[in-house]
UniProtKB/Swiss-Prot annotation:
Protein name: Serine protease hepsin
Subcellular location: Membrane
Catalytic residues (positions): H203, D257, S353
Keyword annotations from UniProtKB, A to Z: Disulfide bond, Glycoprotein, Hydrolase, Membrane, Protease, Serine protease, Signal-anchor, Transmembrane, Transmembrane helix
One GO MF term: serine-type exopeptidase activity
Organism: Pongo abelii
Annotated catalysed reactions: Cleavage after basic amino-acid residues, with Arg strongly preferred to Lys
Amino acid sequence: MAQKEGGRTVPCCSRPKVAALTAGTLLLLTAIGAASWAIVAVLLRSDQEPLYPVQVSSADARLMVFDKTEGTWRLLCSSRSNARVAGLSCVEMGFLRALTHSELDVRTAGANGTSGFFCVDEGRLPHTQRLLEVISVCDCPRGRFLATICQDCGRRKLPVDRIVGGRDTSLGRWPWQVSLRYDGAHLCGGSLLSGDWVLTAAHCFPERNRVLSRWRVFAGAVAQASPHGLQLAVQAVVYHGGYLPFRDPNSEENSNDIALVHLSSPLPLTEYIQPVCLPAAGQALVDGKICTVTGWGNTQYYGQQAGVLQEARVPIISNDVCNGADFYGNQIKPKMFCAGYPEGGIDACQGDSGGPFVCEDSISRTPRWRLCGIVSWGTGCALAQKPGVYTKVSDFREWIFQAIKTHSEASGMVTQL
């Protein structure tokens, strides 16, 4: 993940060969099957996990919104803005986009546990990122309501066993993980947001690595030498214009370490290739929560790359602790976070950069994996009181959606503030 050179902590890609996870106890969460609803809400359930009040039924794709005042779920009255409302709702829940939308009639489809309707203020709709800000209770005389299907994400398509100990991960366990290769060598990790967009770290693309024809994205395999993985060319790289080391090579500021890779053509989604979810709007990190980081990086600080994808479970550390004098001494900025163990021993390392830090949650009734962090930097690998540092993805939701919207036809290296 990072090197310490001349007293300065720098991203792992400052060296030509980089790759996955520090050796140590490796664990895997069990896969969870599909359930009836995709839910995100600001309610509290028995596990005290914050939820956001928007649901999409897997039965008939009806969109439902929770009425906090009445304690009931309401349908969303159909309008001329159905396409925009569907897109906004899916994005708010952490999906990349709405795939389709339609109208249903409550007289034929039934209320199915809902009570009444919300209507959208279409005049205010273009100026908000949150559905709750532009809806109010209404009668909806026609009784027609909105249904939508969001791009699926954050779910495995194969049953997987629980792994305890230091074994390699298995095919289909982390289907959003990709390898970014330059001249055929693994350089960084990345996470699929869709068939043609990958989220990774900006520092993977210094000046010396900007010939896009030499980049390939490798997906659908856990072994670097696998003949069964798919390799696709890169059309464009969109990096954050606020990543200071690209403007000043002497800068030690690692904020805004985020980039999007647009593939030349979409990857086919299979059991081994699937997108990960983004955090829902307003979803906060939970200090102490144990999540998973994956990659092909070095298994020791001065070790070799891992030939097979590795995984490690590490807890999120509060920024107050990580900014302490014994840790990183105020180097952790608001759009970063730390994860690891104070005693060290399990961490991301060189070559994991840009790869996923994912957390499973139940903010939808179908548990999903969300991309909460991007492997960014650190001091050494698995050192005591020097945990891995990650880009906080929740703080870049708007940047991600705007970059995809703006640069879908771009080619080459592109910057986006």
